[in-house]
Amino acid sequence: MAVTQVIKRDGSRVGFDTSRIEAALAKAFEAAGEEPDGPRLAKVLEAIVAELSEGHREEAPSVEQIQDTVERQLVKQDLYEVSKRYIIYRAKRAEEREQRGELARRHALDGSLSMKKRDGRSEPFTYDKVGTTLRRLAEDLEEIDEDLILKELKKNIYSGIDAAEVEQALLLATVAFIERDPEYNVLASRILRQKLYREVIGRSVSSWDELVGEYRAAFVQGIRAGVERGHFDQTLLEFDLDALSQAIDPSRDELIKYVGVQTLYERYFVKVEGRLLETPQAFWMRVAMGLSIRERQRNVRAQEFYGILSSLRFVSSTPTLFHAGLTHPQLSSCYLSTVTDDLDHIFKCIGDNAQMSKWSGGIGNDWTSIRATGAMINSTKVESQGVIPFLKIANDTTVAINRSGKRRGATCAYLESWHLDIEDFLDLRRNTGDDRRRTHDMNTANWIPDLFMKRVVNEEMWSLFSPDEVPDLHESYGLEFEERYLEYERRAEKAEIKKFKQVEAIKLWRKMLTRLFETGHPWITFKDPANIRSPQDHAGVVHNSNLCTEITLNNSADETAVCNLGSVNLA
């Protein structure tokens, strides 16, 4: 997935702009006597973007990580002189930043720094106010070194800085010492929550009693605003909002450490037209209301759910946290489907993937039934291109869908190890070869029968088939599978099967492990244990697992398996 954002040195995020990398590269190329706008620069830039996209699928890269990537790619492409010039350029810029920081520190000491307040007015910047804030937030924290934080803060202060940037700089200065003592984690969480409270409530509050009152009032206002803007389900207005607001316990925010608050703030809290509607406890209560919306005693049940969620004894899965109480309450985590050897059904499943990903569902697709490369298509009398081209389409569908606007789509494709296209399947995540036969953004998994492992142990041959000629292999397991598999091998020896191939089982196993080491894929999953232990064996065969390989449910052409996840806190 392409990189879209960059984390700046002050912790803020900006759009990813390749022209900035290109400009720095051009200076290094020119300094090294190379063509600053030639094909070599374009090739390096392309490689840099590719590495960043591959290595930062979930989290945006920082400026330093981008610069490290530039250095690596220059060395990889034997541009040693250019690399040397870039390193010098990078060191010079770091020195300039340090000089600016030192100048700012001197200005801060002599009182000549200015700060822009939230109302637009300017006033002299002093560290006294920052120190007062620190002491207030760290009043009960004995291991906090105020001087250490202020010293780190001074590195990012400059004349004309605004109040929001000071707060962000203070947060980053505190985060820098989280590994020093857990209390810095608590303090960082409080600093971030202070910012969050101000954004939701609309102003700063000076006392705990005042915060509690404003906190609860903001919950009621947020629910009404969310319904008014068409974001929340109107049924939420039928709850006793005043009673629920009194059940909210703002002190439970202390249970959430810095990374937890940051994750909730960036990805989970509801924002409408740029306005944040939720505090942590309002968020838990909104989820609780969404889970109770069809209950007869909805207010009682909402308070019960809230008590469990807000105390972190149990936390629902991401789709539930995203959508509970919203106008489209899709609460399920994972979907497991099996794709049949029919063009209409193939594209129906791809369309289903798109819709389920759209609402934050994780996808596990079984593709074993699709006929292999070279198998004859009855209707057109031409040879099939196999399963790989369809997997490429499924991959690109995964890339195209941004799950609920919060994270990229995620899919895992499963294929049984006797499929004639299994060797191409193993290469899907490689960075070399024909990119039209690669799925860089989709997970893959081997669905391995026990018979294959027996052949590996005994160093025997393994037969690969096209599923259109062996349709019952995928619908059987255990002894029944072994009997049918051996029968198909005998038929292949008699030339009664058109498409098949024999490989050494141990060589195929080694290739599986090699690709797993190289690319992390395909994952290793086992068909027979999943089916032997299935409590639903009367309802059909388990064809695959889900995106995360922890759920095994049977499915069919007209039945998609669904799982709903949550985390129980055993601490």
Where in this protein do the model-derived segments appear?
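Extended catalytic cores of very large enzyme megasubunits
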Residues: 1-571
